[in-house]
């Protein structure tokens, strides 16, 4: 839409994503749709990797990359359009960017800013940007049935983890019995939980099933495996990287542990952050 509206000619169309894997995947997809090689007209930049071109039209990046650019380019003159995606995540970087670009618009009225999300309070965000217009884009809707499965009431972290892995295995086995179509996406809070759940499922000797991990620190080749379904049913154990921006093909069932590691201030006076283990947010669950 931005390209059709003539944006990207006087500067880049910059699109932020909350995670590196999402920035890379989005750049891959858009480059494929435009029929160009990644790194030419469409590129991306994440920490330690830059495949963007100043002569291109579209640049995907993490929100941290764009925030870092404000240090050397306070006017963000390289861009004529900025898209802040997944604004409902409300990370520190996203909050800073939303406040910064609002002030920047007063100095650069020709700059266009688009804030996107499936679950934000549109009225509040529109008011924040001076009663900006709200555009609703209808997506493909599918009926979703939510089933709650209580876990055991064990005490102690290790026993609670075992209850969780047993609950996942029970749910998978039940799904295998009632409906063998499609793959299963399982949301867990971190890498350790993913590897432990993978080991637990391996001991169950599930037939005709492939178990794949998905988290930000995986190599690009390992991450790409989830986008290429095979003949067997796949169980994809993922952190919240697959909640937004990424569309994993052939998913029919989702098992959500309801737990996540969320970045929080440990000592606000010193600016220290930690990844706190907590229940997931409502907006993330709705997404």
Where are these regions (language model features)?
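P-loop NTPase motor module signature
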Residues: 1-287
């Amino acid at each position: 839409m931005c390209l059709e509206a003539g944006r990207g000619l006087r500067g880049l169309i910059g699109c932020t994503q909350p995670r590196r894997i999402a920035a890379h995947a989005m750049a891959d997809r858009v480059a494929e749709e435009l029929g160009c090689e990644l790194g030419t007209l469409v590129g991306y930049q994440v920490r330690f990797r830059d495949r963007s071109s100043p002569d291109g039209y579209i640049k995907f990046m993490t929100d941290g990359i764009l925030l870092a650019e404000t240090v050397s380019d306070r006017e963000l003159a390289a861009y004529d359009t900025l898209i802040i995606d997944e604004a409902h995540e409300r990370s520190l970087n996203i909050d800073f960017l939303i406040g910064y670009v609002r002030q920047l618009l007063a100095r650069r009225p020709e700059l266009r800013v688009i804030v996107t999300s499936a679950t934000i309070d549109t009225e509040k965000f529109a008011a924040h940007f001076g009663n900006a217009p709200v555009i609703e884009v209808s997506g493909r809707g599918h009926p979703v049935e939510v089933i709650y499965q209580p876990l055991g009431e064990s005490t102690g972290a290790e026993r609670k983890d075992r209850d969780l892995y047993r609950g996942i295995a029970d749910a998978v086995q039940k799904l295998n019995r009632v409906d063998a179509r499609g793959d299963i996406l399982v949301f867990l809070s971190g890498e350790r939980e993913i590897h432990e759940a993978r080991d637990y499922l391996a001991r169950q000797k599930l037939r005709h099933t492939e178990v794949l991990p998905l988290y930000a620190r995986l190599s690009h080749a390992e991450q790409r495996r989830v986008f290429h379904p095979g003949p067997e049913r796949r169980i994809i154990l993922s952190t919240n990287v697959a909640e937004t921006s990424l569309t994993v093909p052939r998913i029919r069932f989702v098992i959500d542990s309801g737990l996540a590691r969320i970045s929080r201030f440990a000592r606000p006076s010193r600016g220290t952050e930690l990844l706190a283990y907590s229940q997931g947010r409502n907006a993330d669950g709705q997404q």
